[in-house]
Amino acid sequence: MPKLSKRLASLVTKIEDRAYQPLEAIQLVKENATAKFDETMEAHVRLGIDPKYTDQQLRTTVALPQGTGQTVRIAVITRGEKVAEAKAAGAELSGDEDLVEAISKGEMNFDLLIATPDMMPKVAKLGRVLGPRGLMPNPKAGTVTTDLASAIQEFKAGKLEFRADRTGIVHVRFGKASFTAEALLENLKTLQETIDRNKPSGAKGRYWKSLYVTSTMGPSVEVDIALLQDIEQEG
């Protein structure tokens, strides 16, 4: 087992081995986010699903009401007038065959790729490059669309895609340590509701196994899932 750094080991001693009330868990993570940069807040959710079965897979999007605190670089593969439309809407990169060619050579200076349906046959050929990085556009994720302006604005504002990995764990960033605890809780609650709303049809038994929140350099804190589900959001 790898040794913890002295800093992390000292922080871990402040955390009890129990599930915390949601706001308390977030406050504890914030207190332990002592790195010299604004650490990213992350949620790690273990679900009772086996993604090797298609009816137990989870892949969707969540629009975090308080945003992610991160700048998202968006590339758009389209053609004709929509190339300029994507640029005008805020995409860092937009193009047709030229962008497909650049990506095929490993040039990927972006965090999210959006494509119009007519370009998907060409984008599909990039599966070997995009697939392992989780960047392949997908209609379920809202990244295959003709409404480029809306999609770009939504992802810039805090919408993000997530999926359960092969072990049934979901990893989602839900803000920055500099956010207020209340803002982070609002984002976490929205994530919980999204995961519940998109429960795979084949999920059996206990759906939520565990939920931990952490920061980039800090220790993890377990969250009481039932208490999080009981919170009612305004609006």
Curated annotation (Swiss-Prot):
UniProt entry tagged with the keyword Manganese: no
Signal sequence extent: none
Record Pfam families: Ribosomal_L1
One GO MF term attached to the UniProt entry: rRNA binding
GO biological process: regulation of translation; translation
Any single GO CC term annotated in Swiss-Prot or TrEMBL for this entry: large ribosomal subunit
Keywords annotated in UniProt: Repressor, Ribonucleoprotein, Ribosomal protein, RNA-binding, rRNA-binding, Translation regulation, tRNA-binding
InterPro entries for the chain: Ribosom_uL1_bac-type (IPR005878), Ribosomal_uL1 (IPR002143), Ribosomal_uL1-like (IPR023674), Ribosomal_uL1/biogenesis (IPR028364), Ribosomal_uL1_3-a/b-sand (IPR016095), Ribosomal_uL1_CS (IPR023673)
Chain's role: Binds directly to 23S rRNA. The L1 stalk is quite mobile in the ribosome, and is involved in E site tRNA release.
NCBIfam families: rplA_bact
PANTHER family, alphabetized: 54S RIBOSOMAL PROTEIN L1, MITOCHONDRIAL (PTHR36427), LARGE RIBOSOMAL SUBUNIT PROTEIN UL1M (PTHR36427:SF3)
Subunit: Part of the 50S ribosomal subunit.
Recorded family membership: Belongs to the universal ribosomal protein uL1 family.
Protein name: Large ribosomal subunit protein uL1
Organism: Synechococcus sp. (strain CC9311)
Organism classification: Bacteria, Bacillati, Cyanobacteriota, Cyanophyceae, Synechococcales
